[in-house]
């Protein structure tokens, strides 16, 4: 279970708010993270998949820096959350950025990707969401 504030306001998002009809890709990222910039085009491609909900968790970052990052590189996320002190990410078992977690519609973790996503990860994510 998790409860994290949105980047845009002080309202909270909880795992019970996840829709049950899609897969969810939770991406933990930061504007200061160079590998996050490297993987960003793959997230943009994944954002075009109808069966996938992209959730970005901005990690140990400033709101303005995070917004500028998304303004410059594009926003692939359906939902953007903010973990300014990193405690929520640590609760997920995340100790660095980027990390990405694929969750099915029953909120079960399918796969965890440590480090930047690459073309092979992109294929694996598509295979996972369309095979089930």
Kindly give the residue locations of the regions a language model identified.
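Extracytoplasmic/secreted envelope proteins and their assembly/folding machinery
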Residues: 40, 44, 63-70, 122-126
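Short pre-active-site segment immediately N-terminal to redox-active cysteine/selenocysteine motifs
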Residues: 22-24, 28-32, 96
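A short beta-strand-turn-helix
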Residues: 2-24
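Conserved redox-active cysteine motifs that mediate thiol-disulfide chemistry
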Residues: 28-45
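Conserved segment of the thioredoxin-like fold in thiol-based oxidoreductases
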Residues: 48-85, 97
């Amino acid at each position: 279970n998790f409860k994290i504030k949105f980047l845009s306001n002080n309202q909270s998002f909880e795992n019970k708010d996840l829709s049950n009809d899609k897969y969810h890709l939770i991406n933990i990222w930061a504007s200061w993270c160079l590998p996050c910039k490297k993987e960003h085009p793959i997230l943009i491609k994944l954002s075009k998949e109808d069966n996938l909900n992209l959730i970005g968790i901005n990690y140990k970052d400033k709101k303005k820096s995070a917004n500028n990052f998304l303004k410059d590189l594009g926003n692939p996320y359906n939902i953007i959350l903010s973990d300014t002190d990193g405690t929520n990410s640590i609760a997920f078992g995340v100790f660095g950025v980027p990390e990405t977690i694929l969750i099915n519609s029953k909120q079960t973790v399918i796969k965890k990707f440590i480090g930047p996503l690459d073309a092979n990860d992109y294929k694996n994510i598509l295979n996972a969401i369309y095979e089930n």
